[in-house]
Design a protein with these regions (language model features):
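Glycine-rich phosphate/ribose-binding loops and adjacent secondary-structure elements
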Residues: 172, 176, 180-224
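Non-catalytic, usually N-terminal nucleic-acid engagement modules in DNA/RNA processing proteins
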Residues: 1-178
Length: 224
């Protein structure tokens, strides 16, 4: 696994650089406009380019339910579906699913669609496969985001499941016939506001060997 981030400048602990993906590069720090269903509301692809956007964040939960991953895939992935020729990142859908109070076990999360009431189950393997079909330049592994405030026992369970799912999601990504040639996959660190669990989660996620890493489970109820 080669490094995809290249540091170009630092200042008092902050740093700027470039991230390289199979589909192109973007500079950091980077603001990613949100295109929940692939497109950013009220803005055309040209508008986004004129504003200097480099990466658009799309939502796996919504895209897999409407219009459906098959539609996006058959249109050539997110680039063909939206017309946006810049880079894109898809989340795993986990945050939206966990807001629906799903039935969660070690296998995955079962939830009811907010569109038609149908029942679905998303697993780490399924999330990796769906995002491979959506074709974003960066996909995120499925994780467990515990709402805050939460007891240490609940956060511990989230960390353990996140770590186990990270291993499974990474294997599914690496086993996919061509995902590695088209995408990067990022792991997600959990742990709530518990420093020890955050540290443990970071270490366990690093050991899996993702292309990049995200800090998950923030801005969901913590006081600061």
């Amino acid at each position: 696994m080669k490094a995809i981030f290249h540091e170009e400048a630092t200042c008092d602990g902050a740093r700027a650089g470039q991230v390289d993906t199979p589909g192109g590069s973007f500079t950091t720090p980077c603001f990613m406009p949100v295109g929940t269903r692939g497109a950013v509301r009220h803005l055309s692809s040209k508008d986004l380019g004129d504003l200097g956007a480099e990466v658009v964040l799309a939502n796996t939960y919504h895209l897999m339910l409407r219009p459906g991953v098959e539609v996006v895939r058959d249109l050539g992935g997110l680039r063909g579906f939206t017309g946006w020729q810049g880079l894109s990142l898809t989340d795993s859908g986990g945050y939206q699913i966990f807001s629906l109070q799903p039935r969660v076990d070690d296998v995955g999360a079962e939830f009811r669609s907010t569109y038609d009431g149908s029942i679905h189950k998303l697993t780490p393997e399924g999330a990796a496969g769906v995002q491979a079909d959506l074709g974003a330049d960066i996909q995120m592994v499925l994780d467990v985001c515990s709402a805050l405030p939460a007891t240490d026992a609940i956060v511990r369970q989230a960390v353990d499941r996140t770590s186990a799912w990270a291993v499974r999601g990474r294997k599914a990504f690496l086993d996919h016939p061509d995902a590695q040639q088209r995408q990067c996959q990022f792991g997600i660190v959990q742990g709530g506001t518990n420093v020890a669990l955050r540290t443990e989660s970071a270490q366990r996620t690093l050991e899996v060997g993702f292309d990049g890493y995200a800090i998950g489970g923030l801005s969901v109820g913590e006081t600061r």
